[in-house]
């Protein structure tokens, strides 16, 4: 009888005993070819050959998309480290969720599910079975550009990180628009989560969640990439609490049909001032976006919710006008946030520094028995925050959003020269 195990750490299997020596299971020989696996249950040669054999049995209808999917499969180093072509008839109960700047999102039941259940008896990966997924339709993707496809190809290793939203593959809907298949995150994005929480979260939850986002951003930057479109709508909440927040839309910036995208696209409050002035996106512009996310967490409100997102706001941002910092914000938190949104990109911290600093805060707050200035500031702020939470628990505190404030990506034509 086969024994099925859920997917856990794919990079290292448990050790096993051979004679009087312990040998990592990842070096255990593949039962098919005798070569060592490179990660949990993954024989590079056998998996690659199996995928190559299937190349003749599927096509997206566009050569460049086929090449993209094949590229991810031939370079996979573990299960789900690649994209699949999944016919649309494999999905049931397709339901519209909402629209963004360049597409719409649907939920659906994927009957087969991803190939991420380990069958210990058969020594192979099996499909998980029915799973709810999100289908992100790319508007006008009948005319999808080769530059957009190459963009996904360049970012695909970032997409497969466990710090990003799980991405399974690509399909095509009955209108011939292509769709990205992702895990369905039942708690929605950061804005939706904050709305359900009346915009007030505990400081420890905020810091812990930001730590995970910083690690994801560090991963993107370590790959030599830039997110370019980091905002609250692209942070997806997996669990009831925020610790499972993932970064989405990595490598999916801008309309899919643009061949040379010269216009600035995105959510204005999160775009760094130097980008608004015409400079290229950079790791530093991602850090600016992170600073605005820090403010979104601390206030519980969408940035610049009370102003039109127009040329006047863009000028204000370039003139170093910044968002209000709540009185109950710990000093150490406010200082880091202000560093992130500094008008000079050279003065902003790196993602690596953010990861290190946020991890240090968690240690000082949760695991260090000795008093510290960080812990004292945190304790005062958390006590204030808990009082606010208790006072607002039964009230609707959602502020009225300006009718010309937009929180989905769009081309900012008013910035064009």
Segment roles from a protein language model:
Residues 175-189:
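Conserved short submotifs of the Hanks-type protein kinase catalytic core
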Residues 221-238, 244:
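Catalytic-loop of the protein kinase fold
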Residues 166-178:
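Short beta-strand micro-motifs within the conserved protein kinase catalytic domain, predominantly
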Residues 286:
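Conserved catalytic-loop aspartate of Hanks-type protein kinases
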Residues 42, 104-139:
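Glycine-rich ATP phosphate-binding loop
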Residues 324, 341-353:
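A conserved short helix/loop substructure at the end of the activation segment
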Residues 195-211:
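Activation segment of protein kinase catalytic domains, centered on the conserved DFG
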């Amino acid at each position: 009888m086969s024994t099925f195990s859920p997917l856990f750490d794919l990079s290292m299997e448990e050790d096993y005993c051979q004679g009087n020596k312990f040998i990592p299971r990842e070096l255990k020989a593949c039962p098919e070819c005798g070569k060592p696996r490179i990660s949990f249950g993954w024989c590079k040669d056998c998996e690659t050959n199996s995928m190559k054999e299937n190349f003749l049995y599927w096509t997206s209808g566009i050569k460049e998309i086929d090449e993209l999917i094949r590229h991810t499969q031939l370079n996979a180093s573990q299960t789900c480290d690649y994209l699949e072509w999944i016919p649309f008839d494999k999905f049931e109960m397709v339901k519209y969720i909402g629209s963004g700047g360049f597409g719409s999102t649907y939920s659906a039941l994927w009957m087969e599910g991803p190939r991420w259940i380990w069958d210990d008896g058969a020594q192979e990966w099996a499909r998980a079975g029915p799973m709810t997924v999100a289908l992100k339709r790319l508007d006008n993707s009948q005319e999808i550009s080769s530059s957009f496809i190459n963009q996904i190809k360049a970012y695909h290793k970032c997409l497969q990180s466990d710090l990003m939203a799980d991405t399974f593959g690509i399909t095509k809907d009955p209108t011939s628009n292509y769709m990205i298949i992702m895990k369905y995150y039942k708690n929605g994005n950061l804005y939706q989560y904050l709305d359900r929480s009346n915009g007030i979260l505990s400081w420890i939850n905020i810091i812990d969640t930001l730590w995970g986002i910083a690690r994801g951003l560090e991963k993107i930057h370590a790959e030599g990439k830039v997110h370019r479109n980091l905002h609250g709508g692209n942070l997806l909440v997996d669990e009831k609490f925020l610790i499972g927040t993932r970064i989405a839309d990595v490598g999916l910036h801008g309309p899919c049909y643009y061949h040379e995208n010269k216009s600035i696209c995105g959510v204005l409050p999160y775009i760094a001032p130097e980008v608004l002035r015409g400079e290229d996106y950079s790791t530093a512009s991602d850090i600016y976006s992170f600073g605005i996310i820090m403010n979104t967490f601390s206030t519980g409100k969408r940035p610049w919710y009370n102003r039109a997102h127009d040329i006047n706001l863009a000028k204000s941002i370039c003139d170093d006008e910044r968002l209000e910092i709540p009185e109950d914000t710990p000093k150490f938190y406010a200082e880091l946030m202000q560093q992130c949104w500094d008008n000079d990109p050279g003065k902003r911290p790196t993602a690596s520094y953010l990861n290190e600093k946020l991890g240090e805060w968690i240690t000082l707050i949760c695991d260090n028995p000795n008093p510290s200035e960080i812990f004292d500031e945190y304790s005062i702020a958390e006590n204030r925050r808990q009082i606010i939470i208790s006072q607002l628990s039964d009230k609707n505190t959602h502020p009225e959003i300006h009718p010309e404030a937009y929180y989905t990506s769009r081309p900012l034509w008013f910035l064009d020269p």
